[in-house]
Amino acid sequence: DYQAVPSRANLIYNSAFLRHDESRRRNFLEAVNKGEKKINSSTLYPHEIVAGYNVNTSAKCNPNLEALWKNLPDTVKGAENVIVVADGSGSMGHRIANGSARALDVANALAIYFAERSVGQFHDKYITFSNRPQLVDLSKGNGTLASKIRIALRHNEVANTNIEAVFDLILKTAVQHHLLPEELPGTILILSDMEFDICACDNHSCYCLQPNLFEVIGKRYEDAGYRLPRLAFWNILSRSNTIPIKQNEMGVALISGFSTAAVDMVLSNKLDPYECLIETITRDRYKPIILPATKPKTVVKVRKK
């Protein structure tokens, strides 16, 4: 029964299933993609499935990877929109945690994952990591994960990002389309292999993020009737000995380094450092161990005559 196969086995052993049981496996995957059956992908992460395509722009659609992607758990269901700013520069090609996935796989996977779950005007969209950021429309493909990866790869750019321009792009989109406040992203998530810096320079100019910039941008949003999205910056390839998440003096959530805990935190959109700390230390694994009560031993003293 292929519906009982564990998540990771579905990802790793699909070639073996096709080699030894091709007809039944293909029929099962076809039924899954039609919504008639379920495939188990509950313990997989988005980047693991994207990495299965080897990030090849000419990759053919893989029914197994498509089925696993469609059946990923929705960790943000009912929550606010999250829009990703994805770094596609060459340095993002480094592998993460000695695994097969790359930082680029993480960025593209989360950009697609959150874009699919956003509602309204920002559905199926993410933003390029650029000094002239633009909205990428993933719906221009045929709807498959493979086509969305190809679209993302075509928009890779080697540049620093202009954070003010990102906020302005979102506000401009909201005003142009007369969006309701709840249709705007609640969080802007920047995925990169760079350290967060208030100043960024390229070959042409330098751009500095001033401490009062959020006040200026916030006023623009307020004047238009909107709430300013919060900003989170994840340095996926950080090798510094910093704590996993902290908040700087401008209120930006800074996530450092790659781990499954960091992925869980980002997918749940719980980016408040204090909340993350409390959630971590209150998990079952850290609860005190209570040993069963035992009766005290009776000591018998023998006196010599």
Give the positions of each predicted feature.
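Long lumenal/extracellular ectodomains of secretory and single-pass membrane proteins
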Residues: 1-106, 116-305
